[in-house]
Structures are given as structure tokens and as C-alpha cells.
């Protein structure tokens, strides 16, 4: 990466927002390949070349972009040279992969300058999925209601381009993006399930979606922060998109041009917003009436300002004490922990009943068993079955695969309040492994276990990572060690969700 820093150091005064020339640089495509932005990109699948990165294709693409008008590649070009048997798809892949690197440069520079400040200490820990759960433990126990929001998708690709133009002020780059998006829409009808290559870079689509989501999030958060100035203000709407960021400090009244409904905003220091996987959570200590106002505010903001079709049914209001939130592989809810305190005053004694709210995080066992059933580890009732597709592998390979899945699930679900569901998942994987090995050796499970014993499955029962750490800190038999094993542990090294955990 250091050898490319010279190229990426753009002139802050004149060239910071002009990214189009970078599309003609070979090192951009090398970055897309080396950093694995899309592993199916820029790989040759033709005869004699194998799966190797080809700088020759990159050079020819750059020459064609220099010589041809607006990157127009005719459909007849694929018949001109057998070396480019699917060059239309390959060119689209390469352009989208390179553009995915280029368009992130302004954001990367801002992130580097921001993370170097004192306010972001150990920013790498914030990348972990588990980092959000300690925050929920501290905040959700004091809140009453939660809005479960299903974020709508843009109905037109032009909306994605328009959202990006406030960050990338290079018209040529935006025209290239617009051209690539429309070419993708024209070519995707020719894609068949048998083709193993993807026309467009999913990382670029994810970047465009997040940029679009940041647009309405910035408006929502700004209105939230300015709500103290609007506590007694009833008004219509005013939001001019182009000059919005320049008018933030002057915005006192908020009104809509498209409809005449009044908007009431109230100061609420106990409101938290989280967006994840196309969904969002808005938790607050407000009453149900005020939460209902926030609900229709979201719907109106999407429909009348961002031109995204949305209905009130996509935003559900739930009470935290009566509702379990399906959030990142956990069922989270707020429950009461009753306790009794005996107090003695002189000759009189009395008992004080006290109840504390705590965040309860449980494993969605039904959904997780459904994922294991789809992966052919068990049936729909949760009874373990053999994995016939793995029966051709060696015994050690089969055991390693099952142990790896078991440890990954245990690692991710280490924050569960109840470990019994996790033990059931381990049981399913353990006996699925035994049945797979018995199927391979054409034996019954009973005879297989009797012949080899259970020593080969000891990896399922070896101490977990947290147990090993605690055993180094506390002596064996320490009275809190057993309690620590049962407690919740959140890891700051988990940056992706296991495929089985993501059961949606």
C-alpha cells in the first residue's frame, strides 16, 4: 500500500475532488485486485491462463477508454478476438472495481484525518459488530420504546448518483458512474445463473447505498440536535438540498413545501439511532404518541424528499419490555430482574422489593436451527443428520470443518444471556459430524463410536478462548471463574457475521 501512497496524495487545493483521471491509472486496478474488493474481478477464465490477474487486459481497457467515445463497447467486439471471449462483462467488471477504489479516496482521506484526532482512540475497535452491544447494555435499559424501521430502497439509479454528487464534485466521474449503472441495467438481463462472473462490483453498490443513507441520516440527526430550538415552533418545511450544509447554522424553522402538515419536534436526550443491514432502530424514552410522530416523520421524509416509496407499515413501534428485537443475530429485549433487600432499623426490620432493568440477549434458536437445516446439518425439527457432500473428504478434514463452524458460532454468540441454546447448537454439529463420518465408513453411529471412541471429538469440548484467558488470570477453582464462564463476553475482533448467523 505504501508504494501507491504517492499516487493517492492528491493536491488538496485543486485536484482533491477531481477523480476522473485516476480511472486511467493501472495501479488503481492493482489496488482493487490486491485488496480483494471483489475476488471475481479482473481474473482470466479463458483457456491457458488460469485464474491470474492480467495487467494486459487493464492496459487494453485503458487504451480503449482513451480512444473510444464515452466508453462505448460494441456488442460485436466479443467476436473479434477469442482472447476477449466475454470482454463486455470483463470491462464492466474492471471499470466498476476501479471506480469502487476511486470513489472511496475522498472518504478515506477524511477518515484518516479524523481518526488521527484525540477524540477517536482505538478506532479499530469500533469496527467490530460486538462493539454495539455494550452500548445497548448501557442505554437500552433506560428506554421505553423502539422503532423497528425497514429502510426502503431507491426506485431509480439516478438517485444514487445524485446523493454522491455532494461528496464527489467531479462531473466526469459522476457521468462515468451514471454510464456504468445504466450499462449494468442493460446487461443484467443477459446474465444467466450458469455464469460465474458478476457484472457489477457489489462493494460499489454498497458504497452508493451507504452514501444515500447518510443523506437522510444527516438531515434526521440535524433535526434531532436542533429540536431544542423547535420545542414550541409549529411550522411547514424548508430544506434546500444543494445548499443544505451551508445553511445548517441558520436553520431555525423547519417546514415542508410539498404539504402543509405541521411538524412538532421535542427535545429528547434519550434517543438513539442505529442502522444495520438495510434496517434501522430508533430507541427513545418518549411516549407512544411522540414515537408515532417520529414514525410518520420518517415516512414523509422518504416519500416527499427522497422520492422513495414507503408505507407506515415499514416502521413498527414496539415496547422494549414486551418485544424482542431481532438484531445482528441476537434477540434483544429489556427484562426486569427482581431482588429483595432486607433492612434492619433498631428493632424493626422490613424487606424492600427492587427491580432493575437489564438488556437480555438471547440466541434465536428457531431461526438458527432453520439455517442449520438449510445447510443440511439437521432436519427442520433440529435432529442431526449426516452431511453427504462432505463424505468424500478425509476424516481430519471433516472434523476440522465441523469444529471450525462450531467455534465460529460459539465465538459470535458468546454474548448470549442463556448458554443452553448454544449448547444445543453444539450438540447438533457434534452428532452431524459423527453421522457424516459413519456414513463415510458405511457404519452405524453406535458401532463407529464404539470402535473409535469419542477421543477424536475432543476438539468440540476443548476450552474456549475466553475460558483459556480466564484460566490464566484466575487460579483453578476460583469462586468467580464459574460465574465468568456463564457471563456475556463481547469480542472486538468480529467484523463480519457468520453465514449461519445471518439467517435472514
UniProtKB/Swiss-Prot annotation:
Primary role: Usually encoded in the trnK tRNA gene intron. Probably assists in splicing its own and other chloroplast group II introns.
Provenance organism: Pentaplaris doroteae
Keywords per UniProt: Chloroplast, mRNA processing, Plastid, RNA-binding, tRNA processing
Coiled coil: none
GO biological process: mRNA processing; RNA splicing; tRNA processing
Localization annotation: Plastid, Chloroplast
Major localization listed first in the record, in broad terms: plastid
Superkingdom per UniProt: Eukaryota
Family annotation (InterPro entries): Domain_X, Maturase_MatK, Maturase_MatK_N
Protein's name in the database: Maturase K
Similarity remark: Belongs to the intron maturase 2 family. MatK subfamily.
GO cellular component: chloroplast
Gene Ontology molecular functions: RNA binding
One Pfam family matching this protein: Intron_maturas2
